[in-house]
UniProtKB/Swiss-Prot annotation:
Protein name: Glutamyl-tRNA(Gln) amidotransferase subunit A
Pfam family, one: Amidase
Function: Allows the formation of correctly charged Gln-tRNA(Gln) through the transamidation of misacylated Glu-tRNA(Gln) in organisms which lack glutaminyl-tRNA synthetase. The reaction takes place in the presence of glutamine and ATP through an activated gamma-phospho-Glu-tRNA(Gln).
GO CC entries: glutamyl-tRNA(Gln) amidotransferase complex
Molecular function terms, GO-annotated: ATP binding; glutaminyl-tRNA synthase (glutamine-hydrolyzing) activity
Parts of the chain that traverse the membrane: none
Coiled coil: none
Entry keywords, A to Z: ATP-binding, Ligase, Nucleotide-binding, Protein biosynthesis
Family membership noted in the UniProt record: Belongs to the amidase family. GatA subfamily.
Description of how the protein assembles with itself and partners: Heterotrimer of A, B and C subunits.
Active-site residues per Swiss-Prot or TrEMBL entry: K74 (charge relay system), S149 (charge relay system), S173 (acyl-ester intermediate)
Domain of life of the source: Bacteria
EC number: 6.3.5.7
Length: 486
């Protein structure tokens, strides 16, 4: 059910907020023992919030735009009084004393929290397998991963456990799991949405965005969470347009660029490539003009990212020392030993690996060769995008080189895991808005996602193109049944 449809049913009294929340909680009880999308379910709070909405409606009060909409929140966004773990032993018992800006705005808009979702530890991963509390399964085939790091949110939306969810995207952590799970995932422009209350991974790359079952719902959620925030100095102080009204703008005259370097990748699955190109042709049939463009340094994004992101992570995660909060090792007889043991026991292997990479890249003898060089390449990647947007309105690529892979397939091969984000990372490095939406299925019945990238603050254009494609293609109304959780 779309948010607009739910709003109408609630207003007409066809379904109460409590009935919807009870339905969602029952769905979670049936499905989540298999999926493990949720770390915590806030059933008591959800029912109480739903009852308040029903009481307000009965009293004739006007309702906020997301009244009664059941949401899940990635567990690296702080929720006051509710455990926020980042799927790490380091924060297993951490209960924030404050609310993140994005969740605060959602509750003010009437949304109802169903619970907190699983993720790769501290958002570092592409499969949700690095969670300290167990992996999440893909609803389309439980032997496969849902993607990451926001795999819990993507899986929850795909399996109908919630109407929508929030995730965070540092190098593709919303878009890649959206592709793997057959849902819509939107990463806004860097600074379009506040990061206040998002537990930091890589501060110059992190951005919060929604998972939904359709593009219109993504526009509705972005409308609520976007906007300036004095508590986040990187948040842009620019007006928020009406994203929903932009959806129906005509496609005629829209120029869509196909990035040559993306379709020439050696690791690009043939079915993914052909399906995404069919999506491009569908957009052409709707009035868009297709143009081949070149972003010569697009493929350099992954090497650049795996210097910059771990460097920022090594600084951000230095605060977890076992002294003020977080996991503290027992039995250490000195402060240095306690800190070292707390980090060794509290952080998982992937987080430790990235801290080591980042610390090395920032060390005195290597900073110029690695970190500063990576920042220079980042600038060049941004310049390539700037040049492309001189001739086109939106860029089109596959979201991921492959469909969802088997659980454990890349467990012993970090490089193979990192390559899953090959096509999503450049948008983060350039701070651009990007969206993944379903465009078809492979021979195994697994979803394939197409990625659209727009220029800075051009979310309206991005959503417009995505909406027209979605309405014309009807991909998710014709999906194969396969192993999909009923």
């Amino acid at each position: 059910m779309a948010i607009a449809e739910w709003r109408q049913q609630l207003k007409l009294g066809e379904v109460s907020a409590r009935e919807l929340i009870d339905h969602q909680l029952a769905r979670i009880a049936v499905v989540d023992p298999t999926l493990h999308a949720f770390l915590d379910v806030t059933a008591e709070r959800a029912r109480a919030d739903a009852d308040r909405i029903d009481e307000a409606l009965a009293a004739g009060e006007s309702l906020p735009p997301l009244a009664g909409v059941p949401l899940a929140i990635k567990d690296n966004l702080c929720t006051k009084g509710i455990r926020t773990t980042c799927s790490s032993r380091m924060l297993e018992t951490f209960v924030p004393p404050y609310e993140s800006t994005v969740t605060e705005r959602l509750w003010q808009a009437g949304a109802v929290l169903l619970g907190k979702t699983n993720l790769d530890e501290f958002a570092m991963g592409s499969s949700t397998e690095t969670s300290a509390f167990g992996a999440t399964s893909n609803p389309w085939d439980i032997s496969r991963v849902p993607g990451g790091s926001s795999g819990g949110s993507a899986a929850a939306v795909a399996a109908g456990e919630c109407m929508a969810a929030l995730g965070s995207d540092t190098g593709g952590s919303i878009r890649q799991p959206a592709s793997f799970c057959g849902v819509v995932g939107l990463k806004p422009t860097y600074g379009r949405v506040s990061r206040w209350g998002l537990v930091a991974f890589a501060s110059s790359l992190d951005q919060v965005g929604p998972f939904t079952t359709n593009v219109a719902d993504a526009a509705e959620l972005l409308q609520v969470i976007a906007g300036s925030d004095p508590r986040d100095s990187t948040c842009l102080n620019v007006a928020v347009p009406d994203y929903c009204s932009a959806l129906s703008q005509p496609m005629s005259g829209v120029r869509i660029g196909l990035i040559r370097e993306c379709f020439d990748q050696n690791g690009l699955d043939a079915q993914v490539k052909s399906t995404v190109l069919e999506a491009a042709e569908k957009l052409q049939s709707l009035g868009a003009e297709l143009v081949e463009v070149s972003c010569p340094r697009f493929s350099d994004g992954i090497a650049t990212y795996y210097v910059i992101a771990p460097s920022e992570a090594s600084a951000n995660l230095a605060r977890y020392d076992g002294v003020k909060y977080g996991y503290r090792a027992e039995g250490a007889d000195a402060l240095a030993a306690m800190t070292a043991r707390s980090r060794a026991e509290g952080f998982g292997s992937e987080v430790q690996r990235r801290i080591l990479i980042g610390t090395y890249a920032l060390s005195a003898g290597y900073m110029d060769a690695y970190y500063k060089k990576a920042q220079q390449v980042r600038t060049l990647i941004r310049q390539d995008f700037d040049a492309a947007f001189q001739t086109v309105d939106v860029l089109l690529t596959p979201t991921s080189p492959t469909t969802a892979f088997q659980v454990g397939a890349h467990a012993d091969d970090p490089l193979a895991m990192y390559l899953a984000d090959l096509l999503t990372i450049p948008a983060n490095l350039a701070g651009l808005p990007a969206i993944s939406l379903p465009c078809g299925f492979d021979d195994d019945g697994l979803p394939i996602g197409v990625q659209l990238i727009a220029n800075v603050l051009e979310e309206s254009r991005l959503l417009q193109v995505a909406f027209h494609y979605e309405q014309s293609a009807n991909v998710m109304t014709n999906h194969p049944q396969g192993n999909f959780i009923p």
